[in-house]
């Protein structure tokens, strides 16, 4: 059966079950021929439903085994300008799994990524932040990306702030810990939810002990 026939929309399904099953099968069998078929559908989708299914399947594969879709970085980029936000955030999610393989290209695309983060949904912003943190791990880009991460933390919605802080904490260099402490201290007075305040204080204590 052709890959396109395995997709959820081709089977008349509204759930992601078929896409998940296909992704799982490709992962287990390490089927790069199937990846090539998905690539062709990604660049020349017959309709938007197929595009969505292909993106979702590749995103699932990328989350489990980024190397399997690492070579598709450039194919995802044109999709970032798609008119449907759901399509954009799945493309961003897929890209966030493979940023590590393409740091220079990701750095070149920061303007686009930041614009999408500002204009898109919460999920889009989340995936963009993951990309920033991934790029931060590359020493050559760290100073520039550090400033962008701080900027994102200062304007992050309260309910996203804690998880963003913790994502950066996982990879932060010792020399940048003071910058994160300062950012936490700046945001703390503005956090109105007790749970958000508690989380911020907890992270602040961890950083101060580091």
Q: What are the roles of these predicted feature ranges?
A:
Residues 2-15, 20, 174-210:
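Eukaryotic acidic, Ser/Thr-rich intrinsically disordered low-complexity regions
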Residues 59, 96, 133-134, 166-171, ...:
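Structural signature of alpha-helical solenoid repeat scaffolds
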Residues 18-22, 54, 91, 128, ...:
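Conserved hydrophobic register position within alpha-solenoid helical repeats
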Residues 7-12, 42-46, 79-83, 117-120, ...:
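Alpha-solenoid helical repeat architecture
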Residues 12-17, 32, 47-49, 85-86, ...:
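Alpha-helix N-cap/helix-start positions at coil->helix boundaries
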Residues 135-137, 141-142, 146-195:
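Extended alpha-helical scaffolding segments
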Residues 21-22, 49-62, 74, 90-97:
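Non-membrane alpha-helical segments in proteins
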Residues 1-7, 29-42, 66-79, 103-116, ...:
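Amphipathic alpha-helical scaffolding segments comprising HEAT/armadillo-like alpha-solenoid repeats
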């Amino acid at each position: 059966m052709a890959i396109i026939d395995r997709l959820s929309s081709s089977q008349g399904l509204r759930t992601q079950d078929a896409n998940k099953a296909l992704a799982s099968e490709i992962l287990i069998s390490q089927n790069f021929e199937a990846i090539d078929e998905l690539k062709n559908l990604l660049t020349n989708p017959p309709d938007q439903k197929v595009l969505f299914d292909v993106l979702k399947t590749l995103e699932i594969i990328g989350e489990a085994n980024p190397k399997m879709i690492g070579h598709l970085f450039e194919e995802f980029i044109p999709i970032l300008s798609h008119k449907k936000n759901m399509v954009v955030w799945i493309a961003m999610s897929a890209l966030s799994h493979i940023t590590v393989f393409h740091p220079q290209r990701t750095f070149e695309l920061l303007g686009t990524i930041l614009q999408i983060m500002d204009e898109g949904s919460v999920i889009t912003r989340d995936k963009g932040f993951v990309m920033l943190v991934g790029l931060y791990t590359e020493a050559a880009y760290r100073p520039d990306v550090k400033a962008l991460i701080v900027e994102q933390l200062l304007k992050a919605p309260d309910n996203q702030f804690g998880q963003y802080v913790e994502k950066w904490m996982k990879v932060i260099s010792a020399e940048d810990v003071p910058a994160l402490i300062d950012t936490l201290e700046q945001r703390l007075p503005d956090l109105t939810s007790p749970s958000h305040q508690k989380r911020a204080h907890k992270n602040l204590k961890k950083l101060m002990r580091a």
